[in-house]
Amino acid sequence: MWFKNLTLYRFNKPFSIETEALETALADFTFSPCGSQDVSKFGFSNALGKQGSTLVHSANNRHLICVTKEEKILPGQVIKESLEEKVALIEDEENRKLAKKEKDALKDEIITSLLPRAFSRRSQTRALILPELEMILVDSSSATKAEELLALLRKALGSLPVIPLSFKAPVESNLTQWLKDGSAPLPFEMQDEAELKSAADEGGIVRFKQQDLKEDEVLAHLETGKEVHKLALHFGQSIALLLQSDASVKRLKFSEEFRAGNDELGNEDPMARLDADFALMGSELVALMHALVSALGGLEETQA
């Protein structure tokens, strides 16, 4: 349940749906496994996984939701070879070249025949709805997966006025200034990893790992016009992260000490522990968002 990435969105209008109403809305779009002829299936599933029983898990007016996607695995090479064999056989028997439309129909037949025997894979994506911040935090490093979740949520609710999080000043401008200053605004602390990119299209990219970012070798690249597009940070003593210039957060990791905050509860009651961990994570992510918005100079004004 602990989030590992953050793709960030904000509401254009206040989110005011209660937990029960949200649960009811999502119930019409629940996940069901692929049938024999399904290529993929996508829907909402229990927010807390196997231990949970609801599509929405809420605490302190913070709502956790989850989508599950199942996809049949159809190797492209197998389809290609089967199609080539069938096309060659028919063209030889009928002494003519098949049209593209005929080849496409044959390909569909092959896929239909393979689907019942195909293996499938499942993936899950979670999101945290934070009405107090008018934000949605999607636990995904893929903008495509985040948009898939939001599209289904929009379908369930009828509308979902959200936009990607954007700041008054470019994120890379702030990250570059932090590197020049040798420190990030508190409570953030720079670590030993960064990616610098030239503003020019034909310019280069330089990556530093396990290196003191205050060294002249690093700072010299700023003098040539490069800007910081990725920067490893610590948020207090609780979270390690990689902040990117598109305002997304990768490699989010809660410290062992922080996650141990609910150890006194034990694991005898898994649901109670999950509930406590969710509350702990939610509170810290809210604190992280407040600090991030402040450190980056505030959010860009939205159009009403």
UniProtKB/Swiss-Prot annotation:
Localization terms from the record: Cytoplasm, Nucleoid
Keyword terms of this UniProt record: Cytoplasm, DNA recombination
Source species, domain of life: Bacteria
Keyword presence, Membrane: no
UniProt KW Cytoplasm keyword: yes
Cited InterPro entries: RdgC (IPR007476)
Residues spanning the signal sequence: none
One GO MF term: double-stranded DNA binding
One annotated GO biological process: DNA recombination
Intrachain S-S bonds: none
GO cellular component terms given for this protein: bacterial nucleoid; cytoplasm
Family per similarity comment: Belongs to the RdgC family.
PANTHER family reported in the protein's UniProt record: RECOMBINATION-ASSOCIATED PROTEIN RDGC
Function description: May be involved in recombination.
Protein name, per record: Recombination-associated protein RdgC
